[in-house]
């Protein structure tokens, strides 16, 4: 099932639905993740920064994160042929908050068109680059909606249970050190309180004129 379908049924489903999302379209997904997910028929969405196809994760330059190879256009087509949904992760992987109207349109719309031309189908979902509360704003969300996307995901922590907020979809981040027990607790909602803490911290910092560096 597509992410859009899961969002649409989340309010009335008899049991929780889960999909897996991958930001950045790292090349190593093809070797380490997609074959396993395909074997178990597990749905997943891969969010592609179209301006970096066949390059490295240059946005991590100067950070503690190593530069990672990004899928090529052929890799993206291969992933789609395996049954995985493809979404846009903008063109340049830059923060959308505060961009000019022209640049914002390029980041949101040009990436959508490039993927649609590549795959021959509509691209229905978008992932905000970096995805935090200070990384995009209402203007960006409006452009995403007007471009024809049906949903947009953030890095706001938590389970998503409100289909009316389809342009601010929450996600549960899984870290490399998480155990199976911790993963189950996250899915069951034991860490939902972190979402309220995240909102409170953002509101305090906004009220005091500070921004959270990401």
Please give the residue ranges for each predicted region.
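Hydrophobic/aromatic pocket-lining and membrane-interface residues
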Residues: 23, 37
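Alpha-helical segments flanking ligand/cofactor-binding loops in enzyme cores
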Residues: 35, 77, 141-142
């Amino acid at each position: 099932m597509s992410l859009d379908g899961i969002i649409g049924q989340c309010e009335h489903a008899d049991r929780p639905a889960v999909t897996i999302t991958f930001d950045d379209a790292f090349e190593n997904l093809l070797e380490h993740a997609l074959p396993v997910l395909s074997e178990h028929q597990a749905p997943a969405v891969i969010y592609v920064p179209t301006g970096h196809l066949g390059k490295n994760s240059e946005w991590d330059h100067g950070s503690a994160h190593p530069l990672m190879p990004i899928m090529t256009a052929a890799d993206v087509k291969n992933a789609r042929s395996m049954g995985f949904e493809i979404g846009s992760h903008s063109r340049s992987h830059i923060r959308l908050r505060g961009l000019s109207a022209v640049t914002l349109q390029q980041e949101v719309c040009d990436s959508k068109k490039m993927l649609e031309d590549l795959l021959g189908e509509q691209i229905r979902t978008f992932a905000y680059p970096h995805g935090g509360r200070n990384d995009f704003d209402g203007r960006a969300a409006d452009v995403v909606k007007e471009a024809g996307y049906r949903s947009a995901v953030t890095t706001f922590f938590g389970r998503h249970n409100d289909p009316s907020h389809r342009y601010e979809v929450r996600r549960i981040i899984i870290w490399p050190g998480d155990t199976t027990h911790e993963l189950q607790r996250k899915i069951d909602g034991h860490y939902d309180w972190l979402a309220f803490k995240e909102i409170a911290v953002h509101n305090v910092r906004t009220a005091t004129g500070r921004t959270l560096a990401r």
